[in-house]
Structures are given as structure tokens and as C-alpha cells.
Swiss-Prot record:
GO biological process, one term: NAD-cap decapping
Binding site for a divalent metal cation: 166, 217, 235-236
GO-annotated cellular components: cytosol; nucleus
Residues binding substrate: 215, 237, 261
Organism: Lachancea thermotolerans (strain ATCC 56472 / CBS 6340 / NRRL Y-8284) (Yeast)
Gene designation per UniProt: RAI1
Subcellular location: Nucleus
Stated name of the protein: Decapping nuclease RAI1
Job of this protein: Decapping enzyme for NAD-capped RNAs: specifically hydrolyzes the nicotinamide adenine dinucleotide (NAD) cap from a subset of RNAs by removing the entire NAD moiety from the 5'-end of an NAD-capped RNA. The NAD-cap is present at the 5'-end of some RNAs and snoRNAs. In contrast to the canonical 5'-end N7 methylguanosine (m7G) cap, the NAD cap promotes mRNA decay. Also acts as a non-canonical decapping enzyme that removes the entire cap structure of m7G capped or incompletely capped RNAs.
Family label: Belongs to the DXO/Dom3Z family.
Main location: nucleus
Length: 383
């Protein structure tokens, strides 16, 4: 019988110290699924003058031409390939293994933290963990998550409007490099969710060091010729305008989740577009990530301590993973685990050799690419 462990979501860590996130690399992902390491070609720049709001921008225009790149079961949307390539490039440059205990995507860590605040019904956690070379690599299995089927439904229009807001509020190059013609025609640009720019960030909580990959929506102002542009990135969100008490409470819950998303990788700015019931963009508000905890504390008694509570749970769950899973430095010794959220606890179960997933996870490319495995073996020999 393999290893098995549970962590109840009421658990909190006494230690809540956070390490300042630092960017160690980035990559661009194309619609075709290519990963371009240390390439910023898919990075967007924020541009939405206040005068644009007078044009009654329709967040549903072009909906029938939307290039939907998610939901295809033949495309592994959860792959760690781009993240591993970027880490390998960093290690080749430094000639040492990246100092990390856990390597994954921000979205996965957000899911795990959200387990303390949501039920499994609304926050499904079904992850695979690989212990390799002294580190834990975590990913979701490749499962198609198709968008809402009815393209005329309110659900689909809400889904699309978020991508449309990103398209309307960003340009593909810094403003001085964009032609007037491109600026004037950008409202007609076809929306696509296949191109992505991913930052790779080193951070930590308590004694746990993490490397997290996270999609970046845009640069707010400018980029520097430095190795770390985190302070220039911004998160874009779009939601229905707030006009009632119930809507205010719903928006505050959204803000908490947005804060969680941004604080994990050190993104300091959130820009919210507010639309009306006809999906016309009515206003835009900018928030500092640092001000969100105080905003929630002053406005919603239920969320008074939510941000600090999230940090303490973050510390508890990472401590639990590191103490529960053996991590051998050898690049030859590999173990796989299934991590799920059931009722009121996270459940970790070792995947046995008899399991149908075992061979693909441990010996195949279910989590690690063969290129990355070979790189780590050669790095170990050279050190």
C-alpha cells in the first residue's frame, strides 16, 4: 500500500512569512502550441484612453468570429512544457538547479488555496504530483474544458466579454511603435484566446520555495531592460457593474479571488472593466493589489481576515505537501501522487505501478518532458 495523507481545510500555519516574488524568466505560447522561451512577442500593452468609454464599446461584437483555442481534447492545455523549457534555460545560464521545492502554475496553487474557502462542487481539484530530483512538480491532467455550448446564452456572452475587454484595452506593441491605422481599427480585431505570455516567478511562503508560471494580461506602463518586470504587469478583469448590495458582495468575493491570483506572483495592479446588462463597457477602475485586503476589511465583515487566512492556509498546505511526500535528490527516483479535494480535506494518494496512469506519469511525458529529465541528469553529473 502506497503513501496516503489528508489535510483538513481548517488547518492553518503559524508561519505566514512571504518571500518577495522575483521573475526568473518568461515565454510566449502561440495559438499553434509552440513555446518560445525568453520571447515577449505575445506580451500586450495596456491602452484604453478615457475617451474610448464614450464610444459605447460593445463587448459582444465579433462574438461569432471568436477563435476559441480551449476545449480541444487533442491539445494538452495543462502541459508544463513551456515552464520546464524556461526553467532549463535559467539553469543552463546559472549552471545550477533552480532553488525550488514546488514547481507548478499559479492557477493550480490558487485552486489549492481556494479549497479553504469553496466547496469541491465549485472548486474541483484533481491534480497529479511528481517527486523528482528533490522537487515536486504539479499539474492538472489534460481534460477538455469546453466553453458554454450555446453561443447566444448569457453564460457564453459573459465568457466572451472578458476576452473582448482584453482585446479592446491592449495593443501588441508599446504605443510609440503602433500606427494610427492600427489604433483606429483595433476595435475590429478578432478575439483569440490561444496566444499567451507567461511569466515564470520564484516566490515562497514560510520555508517553502516555489516556482510558478502565470499568464500575464498586459504591461500597464513600460518594460525595462532588466531581468524582472513584475512591477509593470497588470491583471485585466471584466464584470457586470455594481448597483445593488448583493452585487457589491459578489464583486468583493471576485476581488478576493483576483487578489489571490495577483499576490501569488507579485502582480501589483488590477484593472476592472464594468459593463451593463447589454454588455456595453461603462467604466474602468484601477486597483492596487496591496490595497485589496484593506478594501475587503472595510466593506465586507465576512472577508475581514480572508487575505491573512489565505496566506496561513497557503503556508499550511505547502508545509503538508513537503512533509508528506519523500523527495530524493536522485534524478532516477520518481514517485507519482494524486491530489484531490474531498468534502473538507485535501487527499494525497500515491499512484501504484498497477494504476493505468503510472507508466505515463513516471516513465512517460505525463508531467515531465524527456528533454527536461535528460537535462537534469546531465546537470547532476556536472555538479
Amino acid at each position: 500500500m502506497g503513501l496516503s495523507a489528508d489535510l483538513f481545510v481548517q488547518k492553518r500555519s503559524a508561519a505566514s512569512s512571504l518571500k518577495q516574488p522575483k521573475e526568473l524568466g518568461f515565454y510566449s505560447k502561440t495559438q499553434e502550441g509552440q513555446f518560445l522561451v525568453n520571447d515577449s512577442s505575445k506580451l500586450s500593452y495596456y491602452y484604453l484612453p478615457d475617451t474610448e468609454l464614450e464610444r459605447n464599446l460593445d463587448l459582444c461584437s465579433g462574438i461569432k468570429k471568436f477563435k476559441e483555442c480551449f476545449g480541444n481534447p487533442d491539445v494538452d492545455a495543462c502541459t508544463l512544457s513551456g515552464l520546464l523549457k524556461t526553467i532549463q534555460a535559467y539553469e543552463e545560464r546559472k549552471n545550477k538547479k533552480v532553488p525550488a521545492d514546488i514547481i507548478t502554475f499559479r492557477g493550480i496553487m490558487r485552486k489549492l488555496i481556494s479549497a479553504a474557502f469553496d466547496s469541491p462542487k465549485y472548486n474541483r481539484v484533481d491534480l497529479r504530483v511528481l517527486s523528482f530530483n528533490g522537487q515536486l512538480f504539479i499539474r492538472e491532467p489534460n481534460q477538455a474544458h469546453p466553453p458554454p455550448a450555446n453561443t447566444s446564452s448569457m453564460e457564453y456572452r459573459s465568457y466572451y466579454s472578458g476576452y473582448k475587454f482584453e482585446t479592446l484595452s491592449t495593443i501588441s506593441k508599446p504605443l510609440p511603435q503602433v500606427t494610427r491605422n492600427s489604433l483606429e481599427k483595433r476595435h475590429k480585431r478578432i478575439c483569440c484566446n490561444g496566444d499567451q505570455y507567461i511569466t515564470v516567478v520564484r516566490s515562497g511562503v514560510g520555508h517553502c520555495k516555489l516556482v510558478l508560471g502565470a499568464e500575464v494580461d498586459c504591461v500597464f506602463d513600460f518594460t525595462e531592460d532588466s531581468s524582472d518586470n513584475l512591477k509593470h504587469y497588470a491583471e485585466l478583469k471584466c464584470t457586470k457593474g455594481v448597483s445593488t448590495f448583493a452585487e457589491a458582495r459578489a464583486f468583493e468575493r471576485k476581488m478576493f479571488k483576483t487578489w489571490l491570483q495577483c499576490f501569488l506572483v507579485g502582480i501589483n495592479r488590477v484593472i476592472y472593466g464594468f459593463r451593463d446588462e447589454n454588455f456595453i463597457l461603462r467604466s474602468v477602475e484601477e486597483y492596487s493589489t496591496q490595497e485589496v485586503p484593506l478594501l475587503l476589511k472595510n466593506n465586507n465583515p465576512q472577508l475581514t481576515n480572508a487575505c491573512m487566512d489565505a496566506v496561513r492556509w497557503y503556508g499550511a498546505l505547502t508545509e503538508w505537501l513537503l512533509s508528506s511526500i519523500p523527495r530524493e535528490e536522485s534524478a532516477e527516483h520518481i514517485r507519482a501522487y494524486r491530489l484531490t479535494f474531498e468534502n473538507n480535506h485535501l487527499k494525497l494518494v500515491e499512484i501504484e505501478k498497477s494504476d493505468t496512469e503510472y507508466d505515463q506519469l513516471v516513465n512517460g511525458e505525463g508531467i515531465l518532458t524527456s528533454e527536461f529529465r535528460e537535462w537534469r541528469k546531465s546537470l547532476n553529473k556536472s555538479l
